[in-house]
Amino acid sequence: KMEKPNKFRDSVAEVILTFGGTDQHDLSRIVYERIKEICKKYQVFVRIVTGPGYRGFTHLEKMVSETSGVSLTHATGVISSIMESADIAITSNGRTVYELAHMNIPGIVIPQHEREETHSFAREQNGFIKMEPYVEGMSLEKVPILLENLIINNQFRYTLFSRLEKFCFLGNKQRLLDKIFEKCIDRK
């Protein structure tokens, strides 16, 4: 089943947090701790999705189980079906950014290391607010401020959303295979 890109909703109901397969800095937990009060204030559900290599899962699972308004999914594989209900994302600067773009979900992007800092797709012109790369001990106090602005400033969120609508990555795999096949034919 192909997921359909999201339509803009006037009020934010859900934010998704996802930081890749390993989340080496435990940003799932750190960011959740920073945003949970803002989300509670505006009645925004938090959906946390962690990858198969995430070592902090047990600790985060215990935290989440004691709280309402939050869910935790682990090692999901394809994440786009989970994204269908999200209005905003907070993520690292990897492949997930492209899935978010395809699904029309604006977000806050936190590069987890220098290599992710070199990825240039996540920027305001493409619907994302890119922060400085995370370094151990960084306070991340900007995250709840940016999130609250996205929740209450519909015009700004809509601007980011509308910049995402042009992205559709559905046919990419087939286009790539077609080009490879073309090159093979050309060589004969």
Predicted regions and their residues:
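Nucleotide-activated sugar donor-binding and catalytic core shared by glycosyltransferases
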Residues: 1-188
